[in-house]
Amino acid sequence: MPRRSILSAAERESLLALPDSKDDLIRHYTFNDTDLSIIRQRRGPANRLGFAVQLCYLRFPGVILGVDELPFPPLLKPVADQPKVGVESWNEYGQREQTRREHLSELQTVFGFRPFTMSHYRQAVQMLTELAMQTDKGIVLASALIGHLRRQSVILPALNAVERASAEAITRANRRIYDALAEPLADAHRRRLDDLLKRRDNGKTTWLAWLRQSPAKPNSRHMLEHIERLKAWQALDLPTGIERLVHQNRLLKIAREGGQMTPADLAKFEPQRRYATLVALATEGMATVTDEIIDLHDRILGKLFNAAKNKHQQQFQASGKAINAKVRLYGRIGQALIDAKQSGRDAFAAIEAVMSWDSFAESVTEAQKLAQPGGFGFLHRIGESYATLRRYAPEFLAVLKLRAAPAAKNVLDAIEVLRGMNTDNARKLPADAPTGFIKPRWQKLVMTDAGIDRAYYELCALSELKNSLRSGDIWVQGSRQFKDFEDYLVPPEKFTSLKQSSELPLAVATGCEQYLHERLTLLEAQLATVNRMAAANDLPDAIITESGLKITPLDAAVPDTAQALIDQTAMVLPHVKITELLLEVDEWTGFTRHFTHLKSGDLAKDKNLLLTTILADAINLGLTKMAESCPGTTYAKLAWLQAWHTRDETYSTALAELVNAQFRHPFAGHWGDGTTSSSDEQNFRTASKAKSTGHINPKYGSSPGRTFYTHISDQYAPFHTKVVNVGLRDSTYVLDDLLYHESDLRIEEHYTDTAGFTDHVFALMHLLGFRFAPRIRDLGDTKLYIPKGDAAYDALKPMIGGTLNIKHVRAHWDEILRLATSIKQGTVTASLMLRKLGSYPRQNGLAVALRELGRVERTLFILDWLQGVELRRRVHAGLNKGEARNALARAVFFNRLGEIRDRSFEQQRYRASGLNLVTAAIVLWNTVYLERAAHALRGNGHAVDDSLLQYLSPLGWEHINLTGDYLWRSSAKIGAGKFRPLRPLQPA
C-alpha cells in the first residue's frame, strides 16, 4: 500500500478539531428530548455527564474519548448544562474502566454507532477513488471520507487509516487516469508522442521544449514561428475528445508535473504514465499556443493601428504652420472676392490683387496635398502596414479552426473568401465577396470607384475578426480563451435544475418580476427623496444646479492628535531585517507549510531556501542575483525549489494564511471588521526580455508595462493580486479577486476608482451579493436613469440621462441568472465574461440587458452617494489604504529599477505573488508590533486614546531593512511566544 504522507500536521489536526464557536457548539452538541431521556437514566451526575460527553464525541468529531483524555473545555459546560449536572462531576467519571466500556457498548447499541472494519476500508477506497479522479488533494479526500463515515454513524479509525485509504485511492485513480488517456492511442500516436522527447534538427532543444516556448515579440516573424508550433501540435492528430476523458483538474495537474520534468525524466516513466503525461502536455500546449497566436494577432493589429494613429497626428501637427498660413491666405482671398462682388469688380482681378495667378494656382496644389481625407481619420494609413500582415495572414487564417455565431457569419464568410484566395494565389476578390461586415468608417477605403480594394478588404476583415474573437461571436476549436460563449456557462439542464429547486447561488430574488418590483420600487423612492432634498438644497455638502452637480471635497481625515500618536509609535518599532521579519511571521503562522511539492505534496526540506526563492520574487531580484546575495545557496538549488514548490496555488494558500492571521488579530479591528475592501492597479514598466510582453497605456506614458491589480481589506491585508494587461480597464478584474480569494474574509462592500466601474460590473456585483461603491471622477457627468412613468424629477434634470429599458431585462432574465451562476460557481471567471460582454456589438441582447440592470444599480448608488457624506468618507478611506499599500509595494519591489524583466508570463505572476505575500507579512508584523507599541506607551505614562488607533497604519517600512546580504538568522534571540524588544521610549 502507498506509504507516503498526503496530509500535513496542520491538516491532520484540522480533521478532528472540535468546534469552539458558540454557534457550532450549539449545532453539534444540542440534545433532543430522546437524548436527554436516555442520558438521565444513568445513575449519578458523573455517569450522566460522562455518558453525554461520550455521545458528543461519537457524533462529532466521530471518535471515542480516550481513558486518559480530558474533554475539550469549551464543550464541557454546554453539555453539562443540558442534563443539569455540574462540570466538576467529570472528575468522578470512569473511575471504573468497566463503566466506560459499558457506556460505549450501550451508546453503540442505542444510537447505532458502528466500529470501522476492513469492509468499511474497502468501501472507502472505492468511494474515494471516484473523488480522486477529480482531485488528488489529500485533505479533500480525507475530509470527504470522514464526513461520509460520520453520516453513516461509523466510529472514525485512527487518522493513519484514513490517510492510507486516501493515498490508495489516489494511486488507483492515477492508474485509471493514465489508462484513460493512453488506451485510445494507436501505435502511430505513440510514435509521434515519443518523438517529442527527441532533439530537433538543430540539436539544441527537444521538440517538446521548443513547442512549449512563448513568443518573444509581437511581430510577423515570431507569429509565423508560433504558427509552426501549433501545426506541430496539430500534427500529433490525437483522438478527438481525448482531453474530455478525464477531469480537467487532473489533466492540468498532470500537465504541470510534466512541464517541470526534463525529457530524460519523462522517458523513464512506465509507458502508460509517459503517454498520459505527453497527452496532457499536448492538449494544454495546443490550447496555450492557440490563445497566444490570437493574442499576437491582437497585439500586432494594435501596434499597427497605434502607429497609423501616431503618424497621422504627427503629420497633422507638422503641417500645422502650413495649414494656418493657407487658412489666412484664403481668408484674404475670400474677403477680396466678397468685396469684388459687392463693388462689381472682376473676381480674377481681385484674386491677382492679393497674389499672382501662378502663385494662387501653386497654393491650391499645396492645399490639396495638405488636405486630409473626408473623414479626417487615420484608417487610410493602415494600408501602409498591409505588407506586415500579409507576411503571416495566410498561415494565420489557415491554421485556426473557426466557428461563428449568426451575428458574425458575414465576418467568417469573408475569412473563407480570403482563405480560398490564399490557396489559389488569387489577387482579385470575387464579385460576390461578402461586404455586410464592413463598418461605415471602412466603406470609402474598401469600396472604391474601381471596385473592392483587396488590401483594405483584408485589413478590415482581420480587424473585424479580432473584434469578433474578443466578443465570442467567433470562437476557435482547441482554444481556452476563445471558446463558444455557451461552453463557458453551466449546462442549460443543470441551470434549470438549480433554478427549479431554488438552489441558484445568487444573492437576489431569482424571479424576474419580484426582483424588478423590489429594485424599481426602491429606485423610485430614492429618486423622490433625493429630488426633494436637491430642490430644498438639503443634500449634505452637495448642490445640483442647472449647470450640474457640485460636491464639497472631504476634510482631512487625520486629526493632529492622531499624527502625534503615529509619530510616537513609529519611533519605538524595532529595527528588523526583511529576512528576520519573514522568519518571525512564519513562526507565528507557519505560512511556508503551504509550499508543498507539486508531485509528492511534501514540505520543503529547507525552509530558509524556500523563503529565499519567495523573497527573490518579492524584491524583484531574480534567482541568479539572489544566489549571489544569499551566502550558502546556489542558483540550481533555488531554481529546483521554485520549480517544484512555488506555483499559483501555493502562493494563494500561503497568502490566505497571512490574511486570516491579520483578520483574527484584535488590533486589526481598529481599522475595520474585514467586510469592506478596495482594489487598485499598480503599473510596472517592462524592460529587457519582458519589453515585448508589455502593453502600452497612454495613462502611464509611451513605455510598455504590466499591471498588478490588488485587492486590500479594510484591515490593510492584501488578499489577492493578479497580473493584467495595462490596456484593459480595472473593472474587468474587480470581481475575480472578490470571488476567488481563499481567505476567511467575507467582503460585503467594495471600493474602486473611476476605472473600476462599468454598468456590467454594477449588475454582476449586486447579483453576486456585493455592495459596489466606486469613487467616480466627474460624477456630475455620470447620468442617472429613471423608470418609465409620469413621475417628474425636476431638481435632478441636469443629471438624468434617460429612461430604463426594462423589457430587455425581462427578455434575457434567465440568461443573466445563468451567467451570474456560472461566474459564482467558477465555471468561468468574471474577467473573461466581462471582456467578452464589453466587446459585444451594441445590439447583443444579453449585454444590453445586463447594462440596463447595471444602470438601475448605478443610479441607486449615485443617489446614496448624494445623500451620505459617511459613504463618501468610507470609500475615500478605503481607497487611500490601497494607495498607501502601493507605496509599500513599490519600496519592496526595488531591484532592477522596479522594472519587470521576465519574459515568461508565469514568472511575472510569481513576481506579483511574491510581492503580495511579503507585503502581507510586513502588514501582519507591523500590526503585532503596533499593538505592543501602544501598550508600551500606555505603560510609560503616555495617554493613548483608543479612538485614535484607527489612524495608525501597518504599511510603514522605514524600520525594515530591505537591502544587503540576505542571511536567515536573527540578530535578536527570541524565545517561543516571545517578541523582539521595542526601541527605547521617550519619557511622557
UniProtKB/Swiss-Prot annotation:
Ranges annotated as biased composition (Polar residues): 674-695
Annotated segments matching region Disordered: 672-696
GO BP: DNA transposition
InterPro entries: DUF4158, Tn3-like_transpos, Tn3_Tnp_DDE_dom
Pfam families assigned to the protein according to its UniProt record, in alphabetical order: DDE_Tnp_Tn3, DUF4158
Top-level division of the source organism's lineage: Bacteria
UniProt keyword annotations, A-Z: DNA recombination, DNA-binding, Transposable element, Transposition
Alphabetized GO MF terms: DNA binding; transposase activity
UniProt function note: Required for transposition of transposon Tn21.
Family: Belongs to the transposase 7 family.
Additional information: Tn21 is a transposon encoding resistance to sulfonamide, streptomycin, and mercuric ion.
This protein's name: Transposase for transposon Tn21
Encoding gene, per UniProt annotation: tnpA
